[in-house]
């Protein structure tokens, strides 16, 4: 959680808010099929439903009130993965900063799976 203090009080933003914003921003990028999570039992990556997207996002809080975000995504075939990754980074950084006022130190994108067809 990050606390934003003002002269009239404070606002605390929970981890769930950051994961929802980041997951939604990433999933809405062109060529992203969705967020993925790795199954502990079989080691296979599974596409997450919209309501479970936070499982494909990890948020780390730093002492200087910045955050780092790790995203695990599935992309479509035939795309430039580097370009998609950079678009995700830009979109997630913008959305998190504009919605919460929190500075994003890093956005790390892991393309864990590809969807053919």
Q: What spans do the regions from the language model cover?
A:
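Contiguous, often N-terminal, cationic amphipathic patches that form binding interfaces
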Residues: 1-77, 81, 86, 98, ...
């Amino acid at each position: 959680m990050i606390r934003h203090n003002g002269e009239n009080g404070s606002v605390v933003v929970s981890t769930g808010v950051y994961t929802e914003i980041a997951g939604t921003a990433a999933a809405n990028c062109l060529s992203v099929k969705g967020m993925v999570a790795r199954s502990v039992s079989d080691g296979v990556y599974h596409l997450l439903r919209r309501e479970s997207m936070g499982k494909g996002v990890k948020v780390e809080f730093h002492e200087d009130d910045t955050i780092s975000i790790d995203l695990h995504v599935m992309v479509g075939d035939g795309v430039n993965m580097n370009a998609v990754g950079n678009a995700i980074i830009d979109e997630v950084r913008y959305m998190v900063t504009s919605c919460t006022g929190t500075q994003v130190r890093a956005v790390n994108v892991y393309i864990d799976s590809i969807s053919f067809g």
